[in-house]
A protein has these predicted regions:
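Class I SAM-dependent methyltransferase SAM/SAH-binding core
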Residues: 89-147
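N-terminal accessory segments
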Residues: 1-33
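A short SAM/SAH-binding and catalytic strip from SAM-dependent methyltransferases
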Residues: 157-169
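Conserved class I S-adenosyl-L-methionine
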Residues: 24-84, 99-103, 124-127, 131
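Short N-terminal helix/helix-N-cap motif within the alpha/beta-hydrolase-1
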Residues: 123, 168-171
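A short glycine-rich, Lys/Arg-flanked "PGG" loop and its adjoining helix->strand segment in the class I
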Residues: 171-183
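A short acidic, Gly/Pro-enriched loop at the edge of an enzyme's catalytic core
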Residues: 146-157
Length: 187
């Protein structure tokens, strides 16, 4: 029996979560624990929701003028350190618009990956979906990094680029990333 991407995704959800409560609009699931929607999480969620339409354009030009090509080089180097291979299960925490997916090694077939991206900003996820929907099998979830809706030990790769500075509880977010990673995975 062949499982759909949605079925594969739902198999990863913690058992104490009512699947019916994973609201979604058909493109993006939602699991926002209101307990974590305070402090920096709330502030930056609102900011990134407002910036989402222009984010990639602004990052490209401001980043280029301010940092040269170093941001792209950093992303490319980061992706080299992860153990990419076709067919694995991947979680990208704070996926934003998905720009970093451009730096996954070219020998990896993006459509072969069981790929999940989470972000606290629904606006950024909408932008990510519009850019990546035809190029990947990407499931997007609007949730806080401090309360991931996934079972323990389900992802071969869990990665995050830069947004941790904006989390309300950085230590808890890191613990969550470790919890959902398979033993021996690089984070």
């Amino acid at each position: 029996m062949i499982r759909t991407d949605k079925e594969k995704f739902l198999e990863k959800i913690k058992e104490n979560i009512d699947i019916e409560n994973l609201k979604g609009d058909g493109k993006i699931f939602s699991y926002v624990n209101r307990d974590y929607l305070a402090g920096d999480n709330k502030k930056y969620m609102n900011m990134y929701d407002k910036l989402s339409f222009w984010y990639d354009f602004g990052e490209k030009w401001i980043g280029l003028f301010r940092y040269g090509n170093t941001i792209s080089e950093m992303r490319k180097n980061l992706m080299k350190h992860l153990e990419w291979r076709n067919g694995i299960s991947v979680l990208y925490v704070s996926i934003g618009t998905g720009k970093d997916l451009n730096f996954i090694p070219q020998n990896v077939d993006l459509k072969s990956l069981d790929f999940t991206g989470i972000d606290i900003s629904y606006g950024m996820l909408k932008k990510c979906h519009s850019v990546w929907k035809k190029r990947t099998n990407l499931t997007l979830v609007n949730c806080c990094a401090e309360d991931l809706p996934f079972k323990d030990n389900v992802f071969d790769i869990v990665f995050h680029v830069g947004g941790i500075n904006f989390f309300t509880d950085k230590a808890l977010a890191i613990k969550e990333m470790i919890r959902v990673s398979k033993p021996g995975s690089k984070i």
